């Protein structure tokens, strides 16, 4: 059986699930983070080489401030608690998206985690954070124009956050909604 090389997941519905089942959007997000561990371990077991998780979109900044802060704290906790596991399991972390909007401490932690895992090869874990595909394309075009380079498909690919990554073989969206949500 041929398994996909690259699985991309739009992590959606955790807040709605939490509100329905635990009377708290935040508890839903926390449960979703626990599921991430299972997905990562399953990806390794199935020899999937690339796993992209759409964890925080550019649109997520429109959520209530308390929910945003909770999500940012979950990200901080994930980075702090999981970095040793990433290395131990041979997982290379790569961030795609514009992380400049995140607090400086989180930016530093993200860059540190990428650096400390850069030689790992068992699984490439790509976290899409403050990511939107339209923003990604506009950003690539702006960078090309600033360098006064002729715009072409290959040049745009060179400046995308996703450069060097294979296209996803399968896209999964959790949460019972059928839309791409500005992803990849």
Annotated model-derived regions:
Residues 1-183:
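Flexible, compositionally biased loop and terminal segments
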């Amino acid at each position: 059986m041929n398994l996909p090389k690259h699985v991309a997941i739009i992590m959606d519905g955790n807040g709605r699930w939490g509100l329905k089942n635990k009377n708290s959007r935040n508890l839903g997000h926390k449960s979703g983070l626990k599921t991430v561990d299972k997905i990562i371990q399953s990806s390794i077991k199935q020899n999937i080489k690339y796993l992209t998780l759409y964890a925080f979109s550019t649109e997520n900044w429109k959520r209530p401030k308390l929910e945003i802060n909770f999500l940012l704290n979950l990200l901080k906790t994930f980075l702090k608690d999981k970095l040793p596991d990433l290395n131990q399991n041979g997982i290379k972390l790569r961030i795609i998206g514009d992380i400049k909007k995140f607090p400086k401490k989180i930016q530093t932690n993200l860059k540190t985690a990428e650096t400390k895992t850069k030689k790992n090869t068992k699984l490439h874990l790509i976290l899409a954070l403050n990511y939107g595909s339209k923003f990604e394309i506009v950003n690539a075009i702006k960078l090309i124009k600033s360098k006064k380079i002729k715009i072409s498909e290959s040049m745009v690919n060179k400046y995308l956050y996703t450069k060097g990554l294979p296209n996803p073989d399968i896209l999964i969206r959790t949460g019972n909604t059928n839309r791409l949500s500005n992803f990849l």
